[in-house]
Structures are given as C-alpha cells and as structure tokens.
Amino acid sequence: MNEKLVKSVFRRLRRRAQRPLERVPRLTNRDFDLLQSPRALLLDLRSPFAFSSAFIPGSVNLPGFESPALLSAVGLIAARSIYLVTDSPHAIERAAKFFDRFDDMQIGGWFPGKAVEDWRAARGAAGTIEHITPDTLAIRLAAWKTVVADLRDAAAFRRAHIPDAVRIPLNNLTGALAGLPVETSLSLVCEIGTLCSFAGSLLWNAGYRQLAIVKGGFAAYVEHGLPLAES
C-alpha cells in the first residue's frame, strides 16, 4: 500500500480517537502572530451581529460553523492552517469534524470571543460592518448614497429585486464588482440576511470597507412595501 496513503489514514484515525475539544488548543493574544502566515485562515464563528460589531481583520464570518459548504463555494478549501474565534464548544466540534476529512487543512486552535478586544488593544482598530433597516436603505438609495449588492440566486433576482441592485454570486464576489471603486458604499442583501455577514467579511478583506447589511434581507425589504423591479 502507498506509504503516503497509510500515513494519511493513520493520522485521521488518531485524530478521531480524540474528542475535538481535547485536540483543538485554546489560544491567547500571545498567539496572534500565527495569523500572519499566508496559510492562515481565521474563521469567526460568532453570530453575524457580534461579528459585524468588531472583528479581527482578515477573518471570515461563518456563524456557528453551520454552513461549511460556503467555504467550498468561494474557493477557501485549500492547504491552510485554520484558526477559530468562538465561545461555543459545539461550533468547535462541528469545525473539527468537518476538517478531519482534509489532510492539508488542520485546526491550529481557537480564540475566545474576547480575543477581538485583545486584538484591538494590541494591534489597533478592528473591522466593523454596519447593520441597517430596509427604511434606511430606501433613504440612502433615494439619495444615491449606496449600491445594493444582491446575493440571491439568479432566478430569485429575475423575479424581483431592489431597483438598480447588482447581483453578485458568492463564487464571484469581487469579479461581479469589477470596476467598482473599493470606496463605494455597498448595501448587502440576501434572502433573509443570513449570508450577508459571510459575504461581507470576504468583501471587507478584498478592500471594500463601506459595507452595510440590510437587517432581515430581501424578505424584510418586501414586507416594508418598498419599491421593486423585475428583470
């Protein structure tokens, strides 16, 4: 049998013999330098609102690690060292079980939620993403102060969308915005608001810093009786 394959199987069996919380070490602010590696991927598993209020620059929001398929959708499944920000043992366990299937993606440890404040104290400003109501969005649109980035699928977008919205598929976020200056104010909309913090974290990392998430997503916008367009 191929020696490399044997070693791979052995590593997986050894990892599975341990409970996730036993083999994923807790990290502190003394471990922030680990995040400087080009292989590092920091997944912030806190809620969208907690993440948007303050996050470590470069992190990706994946609340509760409940939708790991999103990582594949945006090309983040690759040879990486994974670090987590969370206070949830269940989220750590879900992440550990998911990454067990990959030989070249290892969880290096987890930071508690307070690590964001530790980062701010030690390294400077944390990232933030605004949350706005549908009514606030309507006011900004009327004043031409924002561009709506719609994350829904093509069929839903064709049926109805916010006037002048730009559809940006998750697997081509920055490509869909090509030519749009990073200083542009973007208001993110998905079906009910659950995808926006994930997409927002990726856009923030790509240089777009004037970001807002529409609370309740497109469903809330419709409930407010605001204008719609069709393709």
Kindly give the residue locations of the regions a language model identified.
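Long, low-complexity segments enriched in small/aliphatic residues
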Residues: T28-D33
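Rhodanese-like catalytic fold shared by cysteine-dependent sulfurtransferases
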Residues: M1-V24, A40, P48-V147, L151-S231
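Metal-dependent catalytic core segments for phosphate chemistry
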Residues: L45
